[in-house]
A protein has these predicted regions:
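A structural signal for short, hydrophobic beta-strand segments that form beta-sheets
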Residues: 92-96, 119
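Segments that shape or occlude catalytic/ligand-binding pockets
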Residues: 51-92
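Short, surface-exposed linear segments at secondary-structure transitions and domain or protein termini
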Residues: 120-132
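Active-site loop segments of alpha/beta catalytic cores
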Residues: 3-46, 51-57, 102-105, 114-118, ...
C-alpha cells in the first residue's frame, strides 16, 4: 500500500491537460459580450476517479486519458500566486490510512476523512470555530502580513499576461470560508444567533484581500476575480437571499469595486447546485460569471440567458449525465443548449462537472464530434 503524505496526492491521478487555444483578449471580449467571433468550448474538470481506468480498458489513447487528444477552444488561466485566505496553515498530517479511506489533520487544523474510492473532497469530522472566542484565536491567520506576497509573484503575473493567459486572482468564498471554519449547520445558526461572528470573519477576510489585491493591481492588471463557494445542493442554496444581502454581498462588493476600478472585467463564482434563488443578489454584488451551471440541479443556461441577458456569463452548462444515455439523448441536449448560447456569446460551453463513471469512451468521442458540428453550423450564421 502506497502511503501518501498529502491529501492532494490522492487526487493527482485526476489531472488533465489544459491547453491554450485563444488569447486572453478574445476570451474577455466574448465573456463580456463585446464580441462574438467563434464559440468557446472546454472540459472544466475532467473525469471522476476510476473513469480513466475504464477508458483505458476501452482502448483510449494516452491523449484521450489526459484529454489532450480532444478538440476544445478555450483560454489558459494564469493565477497570480498570492495568498488572500488562510495564512500560516497548520501542518497537514496523515493520521490513519486504509485501502478505502484516509483520515488526516488538514491545514485548518480539522480532522477530515477522504474516500479513496471516489473523487470526493475530504469531509471534515470537526471544525475549529464555534464561538467568537474560537475565531479570535484563529483570526491572526486571516490578517494581513507581508508574506502573503512572498515569492516572485510579479514575474509570474507578467509572464501570464505576456503569454496571453487570462490573469486571475482568487479570494476566499463569502459562504465557503466561514463554512470551512464552522461547518454548514453551525454557520446556518450563526447567521441568526451570532451574526457579529460571521460579520467579523468576512470583514477580516475582506480587509486582507483588499490590501493584497491593492498591491497586486498596482503592478499588473488582473483580468478576472475568482471565488469558490460550492454553496448549493439540488434543492437550493445553503444561504438564502437575505443572508447573501446581509453578509456576503458587502464582502463581494468591497473586493470587486477595487478590482473593477483597476481594470478587471470578470468576477466569476464556482458553485455547484441550484443557485437560482440567489442569482439576483450576487449580480447586485458585482458577480458577472457563474459556473459550472449544473442542469441536474435546475441550472438551465438557456432559460437563464433569456432571463439575465448580458448581465451574466456562463461556463459549463451541458449535462454530464446525458453522456451515459443514448446518442439521440446526447444530440438532444446539445441541440437545446448550443445554438442559443452560440448566438448570444458570453459562454464557454462544457460539461457541468466531472465526467461520471460509466461514461463510455465512444460516447465522449461522439459528444465532442457532435458538439463541434453544431457549434460550427451555428457559428457560420453569426
Amino acid at each position: 500500500m502506497v502511503t501518501h503524505r498529502r491529501l492532494a496526492d490522492f487526487h493527482a491521478v485526476l489531472a488533465i491537460h489544459h491547453g491554450m487555444d485563444i488569447r486572453r483578449e478574445e476570451y474577455l471580449d466574448h465573456m463580456t459580450f463585446r464580441a462574438n467571433r467563434r464559440p468557446l468550448f472546454t472540459e472544466i474538470f475532467g473525469p471522476l476517479l476510476g473513469l480513466k481506468e475504464e477508458w483505458a480498458e476501452q482502448g483510449a489513447s494516452p491523449g484521450e486519458i489526459d484529454m489532450s487528444a480532444f478538440r476544445y477552444r478555450r483560454p489558459l488561466f494564469g493565477p497570480v500566486p498570492v495568498n488572500t485566505g488562510l495564512a500560516h496553515p497548520y501542518p497537514e498530517e496523515i493520521l490513519e490510512e486504509t485501502d478505502e479511506f484516509v483520515v488526516a489533520r488538514d491545514h485548518y487544523g480539522r480532522r477530515v476523512r477522504l474516500s479513496k474510492l471516489a473523487a470526493t473532497l475530504a469531509l471534515p469530522m470537526d471544525h475549529p470555530v464555534k464561538t467568537m472566542d474560537d475565531w479570535l484565536r484563529l483570526k491572526h491567520h486571516y490578517e494581513y502580513s507581508e508574506d502573503r506576497l512572498a515569492g516572485d509573484w510579479e514575474h509570474a503575473a507578467r509572464e501570464h499576461r505576456e503569454a496571453g493567459h487570462v490573469v486571475t486572482v482568487q479570494v476566499p468564498g463569502g459562504y465557503n470560508e466561514p463554512r470551512e471554519l464552522m461547518g454548514e449547520e453551525a454557520l446556518a445558526l450563526a447567521y441568526y444567533d451570532q451574526p457579529e461572528l460571521v460579520h467579523d470573519i468576512l470583514q477580516t477576510i475582506g480587509t486582507t484581500a483588499v490590501q493584497v489585491l491593492d498591491q497586486v493591481t498596482r503592478v499588473v492588471p488582473v483580468d478576472q476575480l475568482v471565488v469558490h463557494e460550492d454553496m448549493a445542493g439540488r434543492s437550493g442554496p445553503l444561504a438564502g437571499p437575505r443572508q447573501v444581502r446581509e453578509f456576503i454581498a458587502p464582502y463581494y462588493r468591497r473586493v470587486w469595486e477595487l478590482m473593477q476600478d483597476r481594470g478587471a472585467r470578470l468576477f466569476g463564482q464556482d458553485s455547484d447546485g441550484n443557485m437560482n434563488a440567489v442569482i439576483d443578489e450576487f449580480l447586485e454584488a458585482g458577480l458577472n460569471l457563474m459556473y459550472p451551471m449544473e442542469p441536474a440541479a435546475g441550472m438551465d443556461i438557456v432559460s437563464l440567458r433569456e432571463k439575465y441577458g448580458t448581465r451574466l456569463a456562463f461556463m459549463g452548462g451541458i449535462d454530464k449525465h446525458v453522456l451515459r444515455g443514448t446518442p439521440d439523448e446526447i444530440v438532444a441536449e446539445l441541440e437545446y443548449k448550443i445554438p442559443p448560447l452560440v448566438r448570444s456569446g458570453g459562454c464557454v460551453l462544457g460539461l457541468d462537472h466531472r465526467i461520471p463513471n460509466g461514461t463510455p469512451l465512444a460516447h465522449y468521442r461522439f459528444y465532442i464530434q457532435k458538439a463541434w458540428e453544431i457549434m460550427e453550423r451555428e457559428a457560420a450564421l453569426l
